[in-house]
């Protein structure tokens, strides 16, 4: 269908090609062209800013970023979303790059601790490898919400090596490595219909 018109012979031909080769489908029937579910942050104003609807929130199949200064409530928003996600049957994967997640904060929201997978790691190479290996264990349709806390703490193995060797140099590879990981997260969420919240200190810190 094109607008209110029926599909043209060409669009039908290309749709058939896409389906036959398992590349895709027309947008009307594409499973990747629709958001199947939203996870509420339990804050109407935040839901509205994310999804343009006060009752929706985090779109499943996409990743969102919560960016702002320290102590601005980013982690609290993520925790509220975790609680709602578990009520909806989601397993939580908590990527703890700040090594700051404590059992007590999850107990405070009455979360199911056994259904939160804690992944404490900060090196980008390690996160990338673990994320892609975990993605192989997840089936399409599995309910998974990834929380990355936080992007600002991501470092490279070079950063660690330089620190060990006492080198006071800026690692220029970090921005590119961060963007590479972000791309993998976005693609994996889209393909497997997972949700992801990436916490960041500032929007410019990418």
Predicted regions and their residues:
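Short, Lys/Arg-enriched N-terminal segments with co-localized hydrophobic residues
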Residues: 1-6
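The Walker A/P-loop phosphate-binding site
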Residues: 7-116, 131-136
């Amino acid at each position: 269908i094109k607008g209110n018109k029926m599909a043209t012979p060409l669009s039908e031909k290309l749709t058939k090609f896409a389906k036959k080769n398992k590349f895709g489908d027309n947008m009307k029937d594409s499973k990747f062209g629709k958001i199947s579910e939203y996870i509420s942050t339990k804050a109407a104003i935040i839901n509205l800013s994310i999804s343009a609807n006060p009752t929706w929130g985090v779109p499943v199949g996409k990743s969102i970023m919560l960016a702002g200064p320290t102590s601005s409530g980013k982690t609290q928003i993520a925790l509220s979303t975790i609680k709602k996600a578990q009520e909806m049957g989601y397993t939580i994967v908590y990527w703890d790059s700040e090594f700051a997640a404590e059992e007590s904060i999850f107990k405070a929201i009455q979360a199911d601790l056994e259904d939160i997978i804690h992944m404490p790691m900060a090196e980008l190479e390690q996160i990338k490898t673990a994320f892609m290996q975990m993605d192989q264990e997840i089936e399409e349709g599995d309910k998974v919400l990834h929380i990355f806390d936080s992007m600002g703490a991501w470092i490279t193995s070079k950063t660690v090596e330089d620190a060990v060797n006492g080198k006071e140099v800026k690692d220029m590879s970090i921005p590119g490595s961060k963007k590479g990981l972000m791309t993998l997260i976005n693609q994996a969420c889209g393909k497997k219909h997972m949700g992801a919240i990436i916490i960041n200190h500032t929007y410019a810190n990418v």
